[in-house]
Regions:
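N-terminal leader/targeting and accessory segments in enzymes
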Residues: 1-103, 107
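Phosphate-binding loop of NTP-binding sites
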Residues: 98-174
Length: 174
């Protein structure tokens, strides 16, 4: 299933192309990944930073793994030799990768017009509550619920982006 295209991601999040071959072709994307260890061919890879990691360091693995699009905010992470080794790469530079991920999730949420969203908040028991709501709704409806304890900014965006356009519900942990 095509998630979006590289061009539609750029339209949703902004940014400028560091590499785009061929310049006017549509690159279909099958989903989103923030981890090269679980990246599947055709997914867009968002190079996020954390306290102890910088996913920009893993661009060679993302490109070798078949990322259909790479979203970065540090252009030095895509040096000329990496560009030469991956001539078909689509690399989008944005001011902030996390903000771009949030923008994409917000744009995608607007496309889920027929999907009811349920947000579960609180200090304890969110994941269990999400699982219970999903188990009940799944008996009669088609939907998506957060896969893990995705109750932070990144996890919420990934949960929204994992929904299918045909879903009747989306259960998020906030």
């Amino acid at each position: 299933m095509t998630f979006w295209t590289a061009n539609s991601v750029r339209a949703a999040v902004g940014g400028s192309w560091l590499a785009r071959v061929p310049a006017n072709a549509e690159i279909p994307l099958t989903g989103i990944s923030t981890d090269t260890r679980t990246l599947q061919r055709g997914q867009a890879f968002f190079a996020l930073r954390g306290e102890r990691f910088d996913a920009h360091d893993f661009l060679p693995q993302a490109l070798a793994g078949g990322a259909g699009l790479v979203v970065i905010d540090d252009p030095s992470a895509f040096p000329p030799e990496l560009a030469r080794n991956h001539p078909g790469a689509a690399v989008l530079r944005v001011p902030d990768v996390l903000e771009a991920l949030d923008r994409l999730a917000a744009a995608y949420r607007k496309k889920l017009a027929g999907t009811r969203v349920i947000a579960v908040t609180g200090s304890n028991g969110k994941t269990t509550t999400v699982r219970l709501i999903d188990a009940i709704l799944r008996t009669r409806l088609k939907g998506t619920a957060s896969v893990k304890s995705f109750n932070n900014q990144i996890g919420l965006a990934l949960t929204v982006l994992s929904a299918k356009p045909s879903d009747q519900y989306l259960v998020c942990e906030v």
